[in-house]
A protein has these predicted regions:
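C-terminal lobe and pocket-closing loops
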Residues: 110, 122, 208-275, 304-307, ...
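An extracytoplasmic/periplasmic, membrane-proximal ligand-sensing/linker region
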Residues: 25-27, 172-176, 260-323
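Hinge/capping helix and adjacent helix->loop/strand transition within the periplasmic-binding protein
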Residues: 51, 78-84, 97-188, 237, ...
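Beta->alpha turn/N-cap motifs
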Residues: 88-93, 156, 185-186, 203-208, ...
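N-terminal signal peptide c-region/cleavage motif recognized by signal peptidases
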Residues: 14-19
Length: 323
């Protein structure tokens, strides 16, 4: 009897070990909490494609949108921590819990519900208007906004989302009042601008470079500490006398509690993905420099960025949307 029990226990332990060693044994879902066309989606798709090569399983993109990304982020925060649900998120992952505090509401998730895998990219946002806009410079826009408070509109990926916060920081620094029109993601926000439904937009470079080159949009300024290589003629806000700096980054996360061996496999796949020639070519094509950080360095980066964004949310305060 003892021999049988020992054999059963050994078989169970061996089977468990083999199951762990076999990760991944099926497809992985990469949740993008925004619609197609935005920075998270544009970065997530080539990342997923490259990771497939090294994980030997499909990595399927699922756009789970709404509430400025909060719906998709909350979904991943509460997903089973087994490595089969991961997420490509933006810096707004840090903003939403802080914004909810302002309104004394319960956040749909907390940041400690996520385990960072890798930072993939980080770029300053770009202020764009349509090519037929009367504003040729930030100075033109600011002067007009002072004459018509609350009349100049801008779209964003959602209330207190990454693109919203960048514009609020600029408006505060310029002492102007703008009209915020939130959408469900960066893609719809850009479509609203191109379609003439709003007047301006802050966006990641990858989402607007094509429209700029195609003559549909005009860049006025960037939120970086230096000019973008892809837009060398476009000044930074700091050059223009506005003390604002803002970056939109894309990073991979898993639910907190994901086993260490699984996290190691995901981290390794992400590292190999950013070194993949095909991935590099795609990122170059969409004018998005790779800014890779492995989990420990990414955690430090995230902590610092989250503190900066928390301070920015408090500075901006409660923002009411004019619908």
């Amino acid at each position: 009897m003892k021999r049988i029990l020992c054999a059963l226990v050994l078989a169970l332990l061996t089977g468990t070990a083999l199951a762990q060693d076999a990760y991944p044994s099926r497809h992985i879902t990469m949740v993008v909490p925004f619609p197609p066309g935005g920075v998270a989606d544009l970065t997530g798709r080539p990342t997923a494609f490259a990771m497939e090569k090294f994980l030997k399983q499909r990595v399927i993109i699922e756009n789970k949108t709404g509430a400025g990304g909060a719906i998709g982020m909350a979904y991943v925060a509460n997903a089973k921590p087994d490595g089969y649900t991961i997420m490509m998120a933006l810096s707004s992952i840090s903003i939403i819990p802080e914004a909810e505090k302002l309104f004394e509401r319960k956040s749909p998730y907390q940041m400690n519900q996520f385990a960072p895998i890798a930072l993939i990219s980080a770029d300053p946002t770009v202020l764009v208007v349509r090519a037929d806009s009367p504003w040729k410079s930030v100075k033109d826009l600011v002067e007009d906004a002072k004459k018509r408070p609350g009349k100049i509109s801008f779209s964003s990926s959602g209330i207190y989302g990454t693109l919203h916060m960048a514009m609020e920081m600029f408006a505060q620094a310029a002492d102007i009042k703008l009209w915020h029109v939130p959408y469900t993601g960066g893609g719809p926000a850009m479509n609203a601008l191109v379609g003439g439904h709003v007047d301006a937009l802050a966006s990641g470079p990858s989402a607007v470079i094509g429209q700029i080159k195609g003559g549909k949009l005009r860049p006025l300024a960037t939120w970086g500490d230096k000019r973008l290589a892809a837009l060398p003629d476009v000044p930074t806000f700091k050059e223009l006398g506005y003390d604002v700096e803002f970056y939109i980054w894309s990073g991979l996360f898993a639910p907190a509690g994901t086993p260490a061996p699984v996290m190691a496999a995901l981290r390794n796949a992400a590292k190999q993905a950013v070194e993949d020639p095909e991935f590099k070519a795609i990122m170059t094509k969409i004018e998005t420099p790779i800014h890779y950080l492995d989990a420990p360095e990414f955690q430090k980066f995230w902590d610092k960025d989250a503190a900066m964004l928390a301070a920015a949310v408090k500075r901006v305060g409660k923002v009411e949307d004019k619908k």
